[in-house]
Amino acid sequence: ILQGKGREDVTHFICELAQIMLELGGVMASLEEIKQHLTAGKALKKFEEMVLAQGGDLEDLYRPAQVKEQVPVYAEEDGYIAALPAMEHGLFAMRLGAGRAVKSDDLDYESGIVFAKKVGDPVQKGDLVATIYTNLEICQKTIAEFQKNVKILDKVVSVSEIIEIVS
């Protein structure tokens, strides 16, 4: 998104969120102006400045994940993605090392889940739905556990991108 690329719905959401945050800070900007900052690379440049100011390494931003396992998860049937329950997938990611159950748990910064589909997207059997990244060994049972939380229906699912803006 910060490189001016990515899904249009996510870009639009990010621009709307940025507009609200700017307004809260007393700065008025149109959605078009905000989008221009993304496409021109200004937002990415500012993010890089913030990473450097906090002692971060810019190379880490652009280095691909170096994990033992990159497991693709495919749609098991044709239809429409009806649900990708955040709680279940969040707990799953935590067990991969991408989160903590307790404060003292270690984090594996390379672990996580990248979703290729979102709720409402059409899929055909065999389409990539997500990729699991982890340094743990993953068995078929674990993949099946993940897949049971990818709900696919044979009818179009109506989705609201933003449920409500609370001011």
Regions found by a protein language model. Give the residues of each.
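Well-ordered secondary-structure scaffolds
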Residues: I1-S167
